[in-house]
Amino acid sequence: MSHHDAQDFWSDKYRAAGQAYLFGTAPNRFLQSQSALLLPGQRALSIADGEGRNAVWLAERGLDVTATELSPVALDKAATLAAARGVSVDFALADALRWTYPDEAFDLVVGIFIQFAAPDERRALFENMKRTLKPGGCIVLQGYTPKQLDYGTGGPSAVENLYTAALLRDAFGDFELECLQEYESELDEGLAHRGHSALIGMVARKV
């Protein structure tokens, strides 16, 4: 899918939700469960952040947050959410696959359901996430596993875009894996992520 096709695809989805938030306004639960990692003043990057739910929550914790998002429709809603919550986020209209990732700039890199990337693109995206992280910093990643195709409660339909523990262990083998778990849970994240889901969560520290 081209950059413009992807932008139109996601903008149409966010626009169709109307005043509602497609993925809700509450932070992702796996990210929330890692709150012990967060310190005020840390620099955080939230990739393909959508309508701002995760970036805004991080900013509420006192972090200095940059959030990338491909869809201008989603960014407008994200800015509205940040204003309503009284926080500031540096929202960047950018394709996560093409954004210029600064070297060793962030203490925390967050990727929540960023499974739009095909395998070749995913490898490059993961390398950029690793490179932009400061030594000692952490990547927090949440995605769906292939079993999610049995449930159909969210996520991509292409099995090659889904994560397994083996895939992430290989991709982040040069990091310290503080958490890597496949599990099933009920999701209630806005209109798009609802119901029983097959999930994987990872926390990887740059050493």
Predicted segments with their positions:
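Conserved class I S-adenosyl-L-methionine
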Residues: 1-39, 147
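Class I SAM-dependent methyltransferase SAM/SAH-binding core
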Residues: 43-47, 51-98
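A short acidic, Gly/Pro-enriched loop at the edge of an enzyme's catalytic core
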Residues: 97-108
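A short, conserved alpha-helix within the catalytic core of class I
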Residues: 116-129
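Conserved beta-strand signature within the Rossmann-like core of class I S-adenosyl-L-methionine
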Residues: 136-143
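Acceptor-substrate binding/catalytic loop of class I
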Residues: 150-167, 191-195, 199
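Short alpha-helix
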Residues: 160-181
